[in-house]
Every structure is written in structure tokens, then in C-alpha cells.
Amino acid sequence: MGDKRDRYRIPRGVKKEALQGKDLRAMHGYGGGKVTKAINKKLRYQKDIGYKTAVSIDTYYRRHEKVDPPAKNFGDRKNPSKGYIMWKMMGGDSGHRWSRQLQKTLDVIQKKERLK
């Protein structure tokens, strides 16, 4: 199904939400550290990402999917939570759906690695 050299095409919706996240961060001055900003830049400017970035995105959503969306001001564009800005920077809801698809592919690759 793939290996660590594979590239994963970034969907248009992910790019759009990543741009919204960048704009929110610029407007409010908070949300997202160095890693989030680096991934956001890749999501906005590259047509695809590599294995390491795919793993980082999947890890982010696994860690944040249960805590960020129910938090206060999540989804509020005028006074957004830090979690909302980071969520958008990582591709938003489109990125979350995409990460679920990527997760299946990554799980297969990681399983193959363990069997070697």
C-alpha cells in the first residue's frame, strides 16, 4: 500500500482551512507554535506532503480531536480559542477528515515496518 517514501496529495479544502488558520493567527497573535506553523506552511504551499508530516498531522488530530472542538470559543472567529486557531492551521475539519484517511494508510505502513 505504500512506504515512507510516499507522498500524500493535500486536498483543496485542507489548503483553504489552513489559510483561514494562518489568517486567524495573524489577526489575533496567538495559537500554534513552530511545528504547527511549519506544517501550516506546507499545507498552504505544497501540493503534497511526505510521510513524516502525515504522521505529525495524524498525531495532532488524535491528541486534539476530543479536547479542542468542545472547548469555549472553538469556532468563534471574533474571539477564537487557541485550539480553534491551531485546528484551522492544521487544515480544520477538512484536515481532520483527511487525517482519518491518512491514518489507515499510515497504520498499514507502520505495521509493515514492525514485521521487518
Model-based region annotation:
Residues M1-K116:
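Extended terminal accessory/targeting regions
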